[in-house]
From Swiss-Prot:
Catalytic activity: (6S)-5,6,7,8-tetrahydrofolate + formate + ATP = (6R)-10-formyltetrahydrofolate + ADP + phosphate
Keyword Cell wall biogenesis/degradation: no
Keywords associated with the record: ATP-binding, Ligase, Nucleotide-binding, One-carbon metabolism
Gene assigned in the entry: fhs
Organism, scientific name: Shewanella woodyi (strain ATCC 51908 / MS32)
Name used for this protein in its record: Formate--tetrahydrofolate ligase
Molecular function as annotated in GO: ATP binding; formate-tetrahydrofolate ligase activity
Pathway involvement of the protein, from the record: One-carbon metabolism; tetrahydrofolate interconversion
Biological classification of the source: Bacteria, Pseudomonadati, Pseudomonadota, Gammaproteobacteria, Alteromonadales
HAMAP family: FTHFS (MF_01543)
Pfam family, one: FTHFS
Length: 570
């Protein structure tokens, strides 16, 4: 079979204005970036405000494995399949970060015959939104350090005279705003800035990957430009010497940050291999951020489509949980159905059983042990009151006997439906059965419910997610986290949602605990204030907000060939 990039390159994309027209978007509501992609102006929402909204379907998965479960393939394939059976459908997915593209995971455009094209344009830069987030974020870091520098060299009266504003008395030991870059760079996790006689007070800092920036979360959770401006103003950048918050508004940088991101608030329209519309917007990771595409993209798509297919990153304990407890809490739009993606390989890998046998070969013992992980994720999704359709993403090595066994077990375990998906190899034709079942699921009465109330304390929210969301028997806060919790309460921010940052490789905090871990306590290392985004991030265990490159990174395969074409993107 051809590689993803070869399949993408063989296709001839339709003019993006034609894709928009079929979907109901007018030409003057687009800002085109060449023939294959365009920004959709947010003002379009005024024109379609009275349109009836379509159905929202969220795609999630079992605990991820190195083999890939095919969540984005399934999201794009389902979009193709729904359109093929006459249901007007749009996909809404995140913009890929270049960190994973050049690292180990690769791109995020789908794959095979269910992908967004041109895939190299999607995976590299797109329309520049991530760069805008990086620039706005780093402007705030520069503004804080500039303020600190000038306040440290001038008396309070002289500073007020020269600047026209009173000193903020920033505590250099309490600068909370780090820097970001859209690459995996472990050496920048912890740095010291201000070295040298004329470069300002020395203090600790560091870099996170741009996908972990609070600005990325703000981009994904804002309703419009005015809302984004308010949220950016609420960013807590540092504390003063009395432990009071210093915001982007107080520094005076919020307006400029918003201007840098003013075009980024518009989602980018692209297409699948079969000409189906796809809105790509925002790119927060699901392990270290909230892991979902934007509310704005969903709002636009829902006003034009019968069905909107979106996805949450990693397993249902990660992106799906945050979709429900963070994104839905902000948007007010609950999902009508959930699709849970699984593969035979994933079940065997999640079995927790040691085996020297090739994972592609039949192995009933590992399959049965790994099924417990799938059952856990089914129950996890069901507790939110959403009908669950399991999608068995078929690999060429899968046996019909194992697939049929798994279908039977899934239905006995209480799923609304279970269908084999051949979207990767067949595109729309391989996802029509799944599409029909999803339509049936959305016709059921939905009883969506959040996991916790906004009025609950931070401790109660953490405990609820740990126990109900991960199966833990409790939480343990480090001394640092306890002190930060008191700070959060003193600032009156304990009404915010909670975003857990943890490993995606286990339902627990320990990536080595496979299957369905039990009896563990969730260790909370730090609590970070994200007042602009509207949540508190709890860093669990040894999770890192800046990834590192592995011994065999993806960039080794990427180059330009003799025809000046990009090769090696996965």
């Amino acid at each position: 079979m051809l590689t993803d990039i070869e399949i993408s390159r063989q296709a001839t994309p339709q003019p993006i204005s034609d894709i928009a027209k079929k979907f109901g978007i007018k030409k003057d509501e687009l800002s085109q970036f060449g023939d294959a992609k365009a920004k959709v102006k947010i003002s379009i929402l005024d024109r379609v405000k009275d349109n009836v909204e379509g159905k929202l379907v969220i795609v999630t998965a079992v605990t991820p494995t190195p083999f890939g479960e095919g969540k984005t393939v399934t999201s794009i394939g389902l979009t193709q399949g729904l359109n093929a059976i006459g249901r007007k459908t749009c996909a809404c997915i995140r913009q890929p970060s270049m960190g994973p593209v050049f690292g180990i995971k690769g791109g995020a455009a789908g794959g095979g015959y269910s992908q967004v094209i041109p895939m190299e344009e999607m995976n590299l830069h797109l329309t520049g939104d991530i760069h805008a987030v990086s620039s706005a974020h780093n402007l705030a870091a520069a503004a804080v350090d500039a303020r600190l520098f000038h306040e440290s060299r001038l008396s309070a009266d002289e500073y007020t005279l020269q600047s026209g504003s009173a000193p903020l008395n920033i505590d250099p030991e309490q600068i909370l705003w780090r820097r970001v870059v859209d690459h995996n760079e472990r050496s920048l996790r912890n740095i010291t800035v201000g070295l040298g006689d004329i470069n300002g007070p020395v203090h600790a800092s560091g870099f996170d990957i741009t996908a972990a920036s609070e600005l990325m979360a703000i981009l994904a959770l804002s309703h419009d430009l005015k809302d984004m401006r308010k949220r950016i103003g609420r960013l807590v950048l540092a504390l003063d010497k009395h432990a009071q918050p210093i915001t982007a508004e107080m520094i005076g940088v919020a307006g400029a940050m918003t201007v840098i991101m003013s075009n980024a608030i518009e989602p980018t329209l692209m297409q699948t291999l079969t000409g189906d519309p796809c809105l790509i917007h925002a790119g927060p990771f699901a392990n270290i951020a909230h892991g979902n595409s934007s509310i704005i993209a969903d709002r636009i798509a829902l006003k034009f489509a019968d069905f909107v297919v979106t996805e949450g990153g990693f397993g249902s304990d990660m992106g799906f949980e945050k979709f429900c407890n963070i994104k839905v809490r902000e948007s007010g739009k609950a999902p009508d159905a959930a699709v849970l993606v699984v593969t035979l390989k994933a079940l065997k890998a999640n079995s927790g059983l040691e085996s020297k046998q090739d994972i592609n070969l039949p192995d009933q013992a590992r399959l049965e042990a790994g099924f417990l992980n799938l059952k856990w994720h089914m129950d996890n999704v069901s507790q939110y009151g959403v009908p669950v359709v399991v999608a068995l993403n078929r690999f060429p090595s899968d046996t019909q006997e194992e697939l049929e066994w798994l279908k039977r077990e899934v239905m006995l375990a209480g799923a609304f439906g279970c269908e084999i998906s051949d979207a990767f190899s067949l595109g729309a034709n391989g996802a029509e059965a799944l599409a029909h079942k999803v339509v049936e699921a959305t016709e059921q009465d939905s009883d969506f419910r959040l996991l916790y109330s906004s009025d609950a304390s931070i401790e109660a929210k953490l405990l609820t997610i740990a126990e109900s969301g991960y199966g833990a028997r409790g939480v343990v806060l480090s001394d640092e986290a306890k002190a930060q919790l008191e700070q959060i309460k003193a600032m009156g921010l304990d009404n915010l949602a909670v975003c857990i940052a943890k490993t995606p490789l286990s339902i627990s905090h320990d990536p080595l605990l496979k299957g369905v871990p039990q009896g563990f306590e969730l260790p909370i290392a730090q609590l970070k204030i994200n007042a602009g985004a509207g949540f508190i991030t709890a860093l669990v265990g040894k999770v890192m907000t800046m990834p590192g490159l592995g011994v065999k990174p993806g960039y080794l395969n990427i180059d330009i060939n003799e025809q000046d074409e990009i090769v090696g993107l996965a």
